[in-house]
Structure formats: C-alpha cells, structure tokens
C-alpha cells in the first residue's frame, strides 16, 4: 500500500522517527554541571572538559542516528545492521542519566573523602568510556550514510506552502501558550485536577473514508481493496491533552455531522453520529494526494490526506507469530475537505420553510454556532498542523526549539514522484489497477 501510494505521486512523510537522544541524557548533563560545583577545582576542571566534549559528540551523533532511522524506515535494508549498532548506543546514552545520578549521590550523601574520590573517579571513567564508544561507532555511521546515499537536507521542499506553514506554526505556538496558561490555572485549583484538552487551530470540515475489505473478491484471488465512506460530513479537531510522563501529547477527534444533505432517522437510537479518536503517536506515515481519484474515490477530485495508523506500539509483548497480528494493528484512513452540494442546501431551505418557526429557530442556532466556531476546509493546513504537532510529540519540545534538521524531516517530501504535473490519467488508471489487485 505504501509503495502504490508513493508511485501514484502522493507526497509522503514518515513519522516513526523519534529523536536520537533522549531528554533524560540532557538532564544528566545538567546533573554533571551541578556535580562539579561540589568537588575540588582540579577534579571539576577535568570533568567539565569531558562533559563539554561529550555534549558536542552527542549532538553530532544524534543527527546521524535520526538520519539512519529515517532512511531505514523508508525501506533501505542496507542500514539495518547500522541501525542495530546505533540502537545499542542510544540505549547506553538513555541509561546515562540513571548511572550518573547513582554516582553523584555518593558524593552528596557521604562525608568520607575516600568515598567522594571513588565517586569522582567513577564519573570520570564512565564519561571517558561513553566517549570512546561514540568515537568507535562514528566511522561506521559515516560509512553507512555515505554508501546509502542518504542526506539530511534542511532545505524546504518546493511544493510547501510558506503561508499555510506559517499559519499552522502560529496555531501550534498559540496552543502551546494556551495550554501552559490552562495548566497553571488547573494547578491552582483545589481538589482533583481536571483532564485538560486544548484545541489546536480551527475545526476542519471533512469527509472520512476507511478501507473496506471485500471478502468476495478475496475468495476470487483478489483483495479488492475499496475505500468506503464512513462520514459524509464530519468535524475534525486536534487537541493537546495532559498526560502522565509526557509534556506534549495530541489526538485528533473526528465527529460525524448529520447535517450533510442525507436522510437520518432522528428517532432511531442506533442511527447516531459516529466519533473517532486518533492518537497522533499512532500515525506512522502520512500521504497527501492532489486527487482523490488516485485512491479510486470517483467523486473526490479534490486533495486527500491518507493516514497510516499503527497501534502495535501499545502492545508490549508481541508474539513472534506476528505478521498477521502486525497487519491487524494497521488501519488506513483518508480525509478530504467536505464539499457542500447546492441542491442539498436548496432542499434544506424548502424543508425549513415547511417546518415553519421550528425550522427557522434551528437554522438560526446553527448559524450562531458557525459564527462562534472557527472552521476551515483546507486539508493542506490540517496536514501541516499534524506534522508540527507530531514533531513536538516525538521530540517532547516546542517546534521553536527543535533543530532545522529535525524540522526538515517532518516537512520534507520523501517521495520523488509527488509533483502534480507528473500525475496523468495513465498514472491514475495504473494506480486504480494496482489497488484493485492489492492483497493485504
């Protein structure tokens, strides 16, 4: 599915790229700074020099680890061995905080000069050992990146809209400020703390699709993959949620709107608006297609955003039988901007006239609600907000604090075939044929 969407000219970005160095290692470096204040000047000078060298090495190797993980996630099998090497190094760096704390506590909790000297020596040797490991693995990382042809270009892609990107960035930054303000107010309150959720940006009016598995076609030797319409009209909102252990945590809520020009039975309890919540941490890949026809959505010629959702990270002890289980964890959703049909609007007006006063009151309420709620139908703006909030969630820091290279990973298009002028009718027909014969 990933390959077909890429060949169909969809812009693509992989989100399964966590920051190479954990937040814990940053705190460990601060712990060393506090540690050197409590020890003799000669020892402090040596450890401070080692700390500076380690900090610079970690910053350099972090970018390389990010790039290796990104290229490997895109399907480069040549980097799998290097990925295992970097994984071991990253785990050692992640444990750095815990080990440094254990060693420094011996100095703080002991008055014995011998114990303090042993702790100082242990910290010094441990930092030297970690530096040696980084220096040993660096040539292999460089060689792997050179032979793979990968690069971490920080230039923005040509198809990126600067205006919409700035708008999305403003929405995310504004949400950061509102969230911090709400958290402070919540902390001042008495009793149980409320679960906070603060909306990011506007409400988007969308149409939601998901994959329908055609069992009849599967029995005939084909998967017959088909996109089915789940919600003709829906409201999509992105929220930042306070959670234990995570400063930045987001989810997208999609709520069906029955005011879609279709018949719905008000008295039928089973016929109620649907809701869908998607944890942004579960979005592993995002595709942006300039035309819904590439997905065999005949009535959707407008842009479509495709989300690959993988919930397997929530399962700690995954069985090795695994391939089927892993596939079951993957869900595909497609979102396009909702397009109102004029005929439906005219029919609604006629029905309101027939219903008289009740209809007018309901219409006035809907108009008032629309005025109060900031709405947008730009799928591209929604895409940029998802990219930026996913970056904050993965790195656990503000987009204003991340490096250009990290920002580039989440904004660049990894698909070289995504130019709009390359998409022809033959491309659409070829994609439709592949989707029809796709086996999942």
From Swiss-Prot:
Residues 341-375 are annotated as: Disordered. The modification Phosphothreonine is found at residue 272. It is found in: Cytoplasm; Nucleus. It holds the Pfam family Ran-binding. GO terms for biological process: protein transport. The keyword Lipid biosynthesis does not apply. Signal peptide: none annotated. Residues 1-314 form the RanBD1 domain. Keywords: Cytoplasm, GTPase activation, Nucleus, Phosphoprotein, Protein transport, Transport. Its main location: cytoplasm. Coiled coil: none annotated. One of its GO terms (cellular component) is nucleus. Residues 341-371 have a biased composition (Acidic residues). One of its GO terms (molecular function) is GTPase activator activity. Present with 3670 molecules/cell in log phase SD medium. Important for the export of protein containing nuclear export signal (NES) out of the nucleus. Stimulates the GTPase activity of GSP1. Interacts with GSP1. This is Ran-specific GTPase-activating protein 30. It comes from Saccharomyces cerevisiae (strain ATCC 204508 / S288c). The lineage of its organism: Eukaryota, Fungi, Dikarya, Ascomycota, Saccharomycotina.
